[in-house]
């Protein structure tokens, strides 16, 4: 199975830009890959929230909203499965989510991050939620499981992930290490951690092009 890990430019809170970038990558790699995987919070950017729920709820995207519909339509048109991260609005709650959509445009899996590192716990309330567990699903004949960023660094979670025995573990992250840090040590730490989580673990990180961002 040909899986493309797309490290794409992201601008915080610029959903139109981020969505267009995602769609352009899908179009460019149709016929060249069977699944294209984007990083954590690709649609809104990792630093898109301010922890004021009345403001943040307008940043969240529901499964029925136009951006998701457009991605589903593109997956069907290009016959290309896609997995991407976003802040999902579900009722009165927000989640850091990873959606996987099949080449028929149908939702294959919806994963909610299980660790709290996506939010400022000192400023958030019950509106900001996490999922409970990892789960295995099938796409194009292979079994997959998803863990978002800090999920696979959380005590007990690597063992939980490995126990699923998925063919492929998708590990979308949002990291801001300098090239020197990454190449000197951090990439080896991630490789060691990935080995604890499964046989084939695929890490993908977007890159932030927002000049006002802190990273």
Please name every model-derived segment.
Residues 13, 46-47, 179, 211:
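Glycine/Thr-rich phosphate-binding loops of Rossmann-like dinucleotide-binding domains
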Residues 63-81, 153-215:
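CN hydrolase (nitrilase-like) catalytic-core segments centered on the catalytic cysteine
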């Amino acid at each position: 199975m040909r899986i493309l890990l797309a490290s794409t430019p992201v601008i915080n809170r610029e959903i139109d830009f981020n969505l267009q970038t995602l769609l352009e990558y899908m179009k460019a790699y149709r016929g060249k890959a069977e699944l294209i995987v984007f990083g954590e919070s690709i649609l809104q950017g990792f630093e898109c929230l301010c922890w004021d729920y009345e403001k943040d709820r307008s940043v969240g995207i529901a499964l029925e909203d136009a951006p998701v519909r457009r991605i589903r339509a593109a997956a069907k048109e290009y016959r290309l499965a896609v997995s991407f991260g976003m802040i999902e609005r579900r009722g009165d709650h927000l989640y850091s989510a990873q959606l996987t959509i099949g080449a028929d445009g149908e939702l294959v899996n919806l994963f909610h991050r299980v660790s709290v590192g996506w939010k400022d716990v000192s400023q958030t309330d019950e509106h900001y939620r996490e999922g409970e567990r990892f789960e295995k699903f099938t796409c194009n004949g292979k079994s997959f499981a998803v863990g978002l960023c800090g999920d696979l660094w959380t005590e007990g979670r690597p063992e939980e992930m490995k126990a699923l025995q998925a063919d492929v573990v998708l590990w979308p992250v949002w990291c801001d290490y300098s090239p020197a840090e990454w190449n000197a040590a951090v990439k080896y730490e991630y490789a060691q951690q990935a080995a604890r989580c499964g046989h084939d673990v695929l890490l993908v990180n977007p890159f932030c092009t927002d000049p006002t961002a802190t990273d």
